[in-house]
Structures are given as structure tokens and as C-alpha cells.
């Protein structure tokens, strides 16, 4: 196979699968209002961050820190899975500048992203310094005749370092729980804001139509008032003319009466 044939084959393969490139879809978006691309990028970035944390967790030697990291990974994984249904709804929304094939490919992108999120490992880091089985010390024997006075309640009394470690761990746990609560609240507010924005976008054509109808009604009412004013003016003029005729007839009658009396 020659170089030209190889380049042609690579170009055909790239063209076949370019509809699955979310970055190209974002660049090709003309309207600039693609909520799917924004949410997909955010979830993808969070997924990369979680995967990096899982790699750090595998090499973590501090047991308390490893437990905290593992809990954070589980919470983030659950949060990412909660965003998948919204991504699926947004993938069905038509976007100006994208073809039908690219819109159909978005569902495949969401399914692939969900599989990656579900594949995130949740195992904690290995415990360092714990009890491990070893065949090199199979000859070690434990003496069961140790006096109870040597292993009493004082042997298990907490030290200053252990109390300090416990306090620090409890403070970090409480602080992390509060931060998680705040983060969940912010996520909820963010989702509400996005939903409100989408609803406003859907209601905007209706508001424009209502404004148009109001303007038309105001124009019709103004023209009706003008016609009504003209009609009232005409009626008033006709009434004044009739009154003038009646008064003239009365005056003529009085003049005729006086003339007949004098004659």
C-alpha cells in the first residue's frame, strides 16, 4: 500500500467517525447556544479529574486520606451519573449548524460517557502496616501464656498524638461534609438556572406574539376612538342645527302674532 493510498484510507476513516467528535461539533455550532456541548464538556472534565484521583488513590499510603478520597470519588461518580439523563434529553434537542447524523451520534456519545463513569473503580487504597500473611515467617509462634497484667486497659489508652489525629480527622470530615452539602446546593441551583433559562428560551416566541397582539389591539382601539369621536361630533352638529331651526320657527311665530295684533 502506497503513501497516497494510506492517507486516503486514513482520511476516509476520519470522515466516517468525525461525527463523534464533540469538539468539532462545538466549533461548528453557529448559534453559540448549545447546552449539550457545555454540559458534556463539564462532565468529561469532571470524569478526567476523578480518574486522576483514582490513580492518586492507588499510591496513597495515608489510610485516613485514602478513605476520604475514596468517599469523594464515590460521591462524584454518583453526581456524574445523575447528569446523564439530562445529557440524553439535551442530545435530542435540535441545534442550528449541526446535521441530523451529528445529532443522532450524540446519543452514542452519552452512552459511551455513561459506560466510562460506571467503570470508575471505587476500591480504597491498600492498608499500609496492616496484618499481612507471609510464608517467610511460618515458624513464628505466639505465646498464649502472656500475663494479663502486661496487656491491660492501660495498654490501649489513647495518646496525645492519637487524640490529635482523631480531632483533625473529625474536623476534616465535618468540613468535607459541609463542603459537599454546599456543592450539592450549588449544583441544584445551577441546574435550576439552566432549566429556567431553557424555559425562558421556549417562552420567548410566545412573549413576542403576545407583544405583537397587544400592539395591534392598541392600534385598533386608537382608530376606533378616532372614528367614535368623529361620529359624536357629527351627531352634535346635527342636533345644534335642529335646535336652531326650532328657535327660528318660534321667533317667526312670535313676530307673526305681534304683527296680527297690531294690524
From Swiss-Prot:
This protein's name: Syntaxin-73
PROSITE patterns for the chain: SYNTAXIN, T_SNARE
Cellular component, GO annotation: membrane
Domain t-SNARE coiled-coil homology residue range list: 169-231
Tissue specificity annotation: Expressed in root, leaf, stem, flower and silique.
GO molecular function, one term: SNAP receptor activity
Domain of life the protein comes from: Eukaryota
Keywords: Coiled coil, Membrane, Phosphoprotein, Protein transport, Transmembrane, Transmembrane helix, Transport
Subunit structure: Part of the t-SNARE complex.
Main localization (coarse): membrane
Pfam family, one: SNARE
Amino acid at each position: 500500500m502506497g503513501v497516497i493510498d494510506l492517507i486516503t484510507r486514513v482520511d476516509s476513516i476520519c470522515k466516517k467517525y468525525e461525527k463523534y467528535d464533540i469538539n468539532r461539533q462545538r466549533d461548528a455550532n453557529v448559534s453559540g447556544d448549545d447546552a449539550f456541548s457545555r454540559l458534556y464538556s463539564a462532565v468529561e472534565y469532571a470524569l478526567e479529574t476523578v480518574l486522576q484521583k483514582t490513580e492518586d488513590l492507588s499510591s496513597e499510603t495515608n489510610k485516613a486520606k485514602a478513605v476520604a478520597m475514596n468517599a469523594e470519588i464515590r460521591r462524584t461518580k454518583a453526581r456524574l451519573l445523575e447528569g446523564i439523563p439530562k445529557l440524553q434529553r439535551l442530545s435530542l434537542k435540535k441545534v442550528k449548524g449541526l446535521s441530523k447524523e451529528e445529532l443522532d451520534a450524540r446519543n452514542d456519545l452519552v452512552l459511551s460517557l455513561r459506560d466510562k463513569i460506571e467503570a470508575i473503580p471505587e476500591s480504597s487504597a491498600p492498608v499500609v502496616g496492616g496484618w499481612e500473611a507471609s510464608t517467610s515467617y511460618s515458624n513464628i509462634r505466639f505465646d498464649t501464656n502472656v500475663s494479663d497484667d502486661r496487656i491491660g486497659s492501660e495498654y490501649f489508652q489513647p495518646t496525645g498524638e492519637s487524640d490529635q489525629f482523631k480531632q483533625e480527622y473529625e474536623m476534616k470530615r465535618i468540613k468535607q461534609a459541609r463542603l459537599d452539602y454546599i456543592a450539592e446546593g450549588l449544583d441544584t441551583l445551577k441546574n435550576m438556572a439552566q432549566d429556567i433559562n431553557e424555559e425562558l428560551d421556549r417562552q420567548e416566541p410566545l412573549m413576542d406574539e403576545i407583544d405583537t397582539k397587544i400592539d395591534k389591539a392598541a392600534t385598533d382601539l386608537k382608530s376606533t376612538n378616532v372614528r367614535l369621536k368623529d361620529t359624536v361630533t357629527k351627531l352634535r352638529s346635527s342636533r345644534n342645527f335642529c335646535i336652531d331651526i326650532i328657535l327660528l320657527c318660534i321667533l317667526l311665530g312670535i313676530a307673526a302674532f305681534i304683527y296680527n295684533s297690531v294690524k
